[in-house]
Amino acid sequence: MANYFNTLSLREKLDQLGVCEFMDRSEFSDGVAALKGKKIVIVGCGAQGLNQGLNLRDSGLDVSYTLRKEAIDSKRQSFLNASENGFKVGTYEELIPTADLVINLTPDKQHTAVVSAVMPLMKKGSTLSYSHGFNIVEEGMQIRKDITVIMVAPKSPGSEVREEYKRGFGVPTLIAVHPENDPEGKGWDYAKAYCVGTGGDRAGVLKSSFVAEVKSDLMGEQTILCGLLQTGSILCFDKMVEKGIDKGYASKLIQYGWEVITESLKHGGISGMMDRLSNPAKIKAFQVSEELKDIMRPLFRKHQDDIISGEFSRIMMEDWANGDKNLLTWRAATGETAFEKTPAGDVKIAEQEYYDNGLLMVAMVRAGVELAFETMTESGIIDESAYYESLHETPLIANTIARKKLFEMNRVISDTAEYGCYLFDHACKPLLANFMKTVDTDIIGKNFNAGKDNGVDNQMLIAVNEVLRSHPIEIVGAELREAMTEMKAIVS
């Protein structure tokens, strides 16, 4: 199979990268009607599969699960997830032939095998859905021309898809229709109905394309969402220990600090996060983050270039074919890092202390979010897509580190995200080696404000605030967060 994106002309590539429209809630006024009475069969019952299925069923839709015969016979976790929640479970041969909508929610590396197995069983005129377009865009999977192909991609882990739905809300979602597979022109109707069924219409929906979703998703997860959080965790911990900070304190500051710091990012963007610092600390964090952006920009651009060209997918799929040799080696090595092996200390850290003693972490978040956004938009990805794949998802990933450190983050994210995370981390740590030699405990481990009078140059502070607040990610972020807030108010 040929990489689909690379078969397109330059103009077609730019057109598909640029598909991005924030949809008005009125566009979802038909609710789930387009799928009412239709048989929905979900392939796979992991976190996304189970939680999306629960939401769809609670929205009045007919949902069942199909698994490989061996998974059913051996009662694997996927079988238990579905059966213990009262869903009908059957083999491909039993359920696929009568399905109107088949939703593929298996791991990325299984998509080619799964789709190749189910497609011959799918009835004429049925619909196939993905929550990530890697199989279509990067692997170039060819779907039978009578089959409609859609994508509904919630921008959060599966557990949050369910929890937000139970609260009467949802999570921001991207929807798309593959232009090569919309024979009856009903793809958008099905995608919108599916999105309503998961609750996504209540939190903000972007009309996207398979290409835009894949190229932006890969970039975000490799750089700021996973890669830089892993690099930052290891470097900050090692620096604190080197400078004599208690290991338990250092471990706790990092493990829970990302979550605390990015919570303000979620509500107020980069400006809201930086506003949690004192004026002198804000100026220092700004200066540090500017230096980090200059150092890391070539690496971010290389990752984006390799994603756009298909080089990243090529080397990752080679590792798939080699039994994940590199992935498993890198995963094991991460588990042996000092940060990962050091338990969080039994010490109380107040919320503000995470900011005051973690200035370098704040600077890394600002640098990483802005760089990811800038690099994506330079490549033709629209601001809204770039926002969701950078700033919006950072708090969600930070939450996984708070639970069980980097192991949990890498367990929860997709296989493509984990592979890209390790590639970035291995390149970024040596890139930052000279910078880290200049770092002391005033910006990581101890309070930057200690012994200072809190005075700053007014013009410098004004200039810093202006740069922060005028960045394009702040402008589009404010609009998208306001839309989400308005919808949440309507729902509640």
From Swiss-Prot:
It holds the Pfam family KARI_C. It comes from Cytophaga hutchinsonii (strain ATCC 33406 / DSM 1761 / CIP 103989 / NBRC 15051 / NCIMB 9469 / D465). NCBIfam families: ilvC, PRK05225.1. Gene3D superfamilies: N-(1-d-carboxylethyl)-l-norvaline Dehydrogenase, domain 2 (1.10.1040.10), NAD(P)-binding Rossmann-like Domain (3.40.50.720). The gene is ilvC. Pathway: Amino-acid biosynthesis; L-isoleucine biosynthesis; L-isoleucine from 2-oxobutanoate: step 2/4; Amino-acid biosynthesis; L-valine biosynthesis; L-valine from pyruvate: step 2/4. InterPro entries: 6-PGluconate_DH-like_C_sf, 6PGD_dom2, KARI, KARI_C, KARI_N, NAD(P)-bd_dom_sf. Involved in the biosynthesis of branched-chain amino acids (BCAA). Catalyzes an alkyl-migration followed by a ketol-acid reduction of (S)-2-acetolactate (S2AL) to yield (R)-2,3-dihydroxy-isovalerate. In the isomerase reaction, S2AL is rearranged via a Mg-dependent methyl migration to produce 3-hydroxy-3-methyl-2-ketobutyrate (HMKB). In the reductase reaction, this 2-ketoacid undergoes a metal-dependent reduction by NADPH to yield (R)-2,3-dihydroxy-isovalerate. Residues 17-208 form the KARI N-terminal Rossmann domain. Residues 209-353, 354-487 form the KARI C-terminal knotted domain. The active site is at residue 132. Mg(2+) 1 binds at residues 217, 221. NADP(+) binds at residues 45-48, 68, 76, 78, 108-110, 158. Mg(2+) 2 binds at residues 217, 389, 393. It catalyses: (2R)-2,3-dihydroxy-3-methylbutanoate + NADP(+) = (2S)-2-acetolactate + NADPH + H(+); (2R,3R)-2,3-dihydroxy-3-methylpentanoate + NADP(+) = (S)-2-ethyl-2-hydroxy-3-oxobutanoate + NADPH + H(+). This is Ketol-acid reductoisomerase (NADP(+)). One of its GO terms (biological process) is isoleucine biosynthetic process. GO terms for molecular function: ketol-acid reductoisomerase activity; magnesium ion binding. Transmembrane segments: none annotated. Its cofactor is Mg(2+).
